[in-house]
Curated annotation (Swiss-Prot):
Biased composition (Low complexity): 310-320
Residue ranges the record marks as coiled coil: 203-242
Coiled coil as UniProt keyword: yes
UniProt keyword DNA-binding present: no
Regions of compositional bias (Acidic residues) in chain numbering: 336-350, 358-369
Bilayer-spanning residue ranges: none
The protein's name in its UniProt record: Coiled-coil domain-containing protein 27
Alphabetically ordered keywords of this record: Coiled coil
Disulfide bonding pattern of the chain: none
Amino acid sequence: MKQENLTQECCSTSPKISKGLMVLQSIASRGCDTQDSEKKPQSTQQSLKKSSQAAAGYFYDKEDQIRKLSKHNGFLSEMEDMRKAFLMRPGCPQFSTRTTSMSHVGSAIMVDLPRTCSGVWKLTEDHPLGRLGSASSVDGRVFPFSKSACELNYPRKRSEPSDPSPTGSPTVVKKSQRTRTPWYISVIHEKDHSLLLMGEELQRFSEMESQMQKKDQEILTLQKEKEALKKQLKNLLRGKGTETSSASIKMDRSFETPLKLGRMSVLKTIYKEEDELQHWMQMQEEYSMAESSKELHVEPGSAIEEKSSEGPPEEAAAAKLSRPSQSKTETLLEVGPEEEEEEEEEEVEGDEAKGTEEGEILVNEEEASWELREDEECHPKRSYSMTESFEEELMAQLEEYERMLMDFQRELEFTRSRYSLATGTITSLQRQTDFQESQLRKVTTENELLEKELRERKQQIQDMTDKFSNLREEKKHQEIMGLIEKENLVLRQQVADLKMDLISSERTIKELNTQTKELEDQVNTDKDHLRRWKDLHDDLQTRNEIIQQTEQQTRVVLEATQARYEKLRNKIIQAVFSVSGNKNLSMELSDSYILESLQRIISERSDFYSQLKQKGVKVPPLQQSDVSLPSKIKKMASK
């Protein structure tokens, strides 16, 4: 139930993922069939390297462990199995979920994945050169390879030695079990290979971007050409009026120049004829004056009237000839700028105006010729010869004007034909611009489609890379978490040991601190004792010196007392021997006897001394030794 709920949630949240899963299942079924048919001949032909064998055995064991662990994982286990089947199919495009036709971009070339993996990452081997464009199924049908984004223009890696499946040889499995390489080496190789593939993919995308930039430049050039053609069309559409106006102006100018020349020639001839007429009239006047003098009534000023009558018709004819030409030029000059500003309808009106102007010119010329004829008829008969020659010249000029009109008509027809040709070229240019616009639209649509495909391919690549990276990262995360937990336990034990060591070291430090304090106290006491001993020593030295001094003094006193004692002894001996009642020398004298005698002497002396004092005789005082001597003698006697 949980698996069904997970699949339903995934399908409802991401329809693209569900479609991709369906495609993966179909491709996996195709890949498994083709792989079983190709496994036996490939396993006998190829051999494993030591590192690949070790990695294959390790990952084979890991696969069994993962299968045991992922039996009850539901949707994740299904995704893992489908990913394995997807990677095991022949001609696997690594980062695509759907098959798209890219025949217009380039031929499909296989992308090789690393072959050192176990059944989880195991792929089919390289196909021979004849099978680069198709993959055959079990039935013998030829499947076209999926020309996805990652298969375009990749160089085929034929130098890599292909490895058979690890189940092919049991000795290889034993060797791989003995020498197992760490799991991260194959992961690093796989990452390097995927990075290389991504680099090639980026190079291909950069080439496609350069192609897109070139196409954008071509589109810009086509747009510029289109704008230039539009400008040419506008100029041509505007130039219709300008060409017709310029052609009419040229025609008018070419028409006006012979008119002006003819007018000038007519005027010159008129002026010459007027001079000749004046000269002839003067001659006639002189002749008439001569005749009038001969004859009776000659009217004065007849010549002047004839001159005036002949002159004005000629001037009128010239004016009449000049007026239509001036009116024509004025109308043409008026029509010209109007035709420049207006478009095709105004051009048609300009052509009609030209026809009306030409008709007016012809009518004016005919009227001028009739007026000249009438004027000539009005002339007197005597100027008939001159007017006849003048009429002939005018007729010749009229014939020239008719010829010029015919030429102008021909030129008009020529300009009409040119106008029709110009309209034809304009229509052809319009068709060309339409064709180029259609090509531009096609190119823009193709570019948009290519950009959409590029975006889709990039999104597909990103989705597949995210899927595979998430799946791989989950496994790696679990393994890393286990390693981290083990390392944490080891670190905790180490921390506990270090704490115990710390406690013991702290205890020893405390003991040592107490010992150092005691030793410091002892040192201080010893220092005090030493100081006291030094003081005592100094005192003793001073006392010793004092004692030595006193000893010397006592020695001196002793020697003096000894000397005095000797003297006293001698005196005592003399006194003893001289005292009455002395005994014989043959008898020995005892100490008591000597003491008694001494006391007697001393007492007598002291009595004598006191008597002398009583009498008032100045006597020196007795010495202390003399006074203290009987007490000492008593002490000695008591001892």
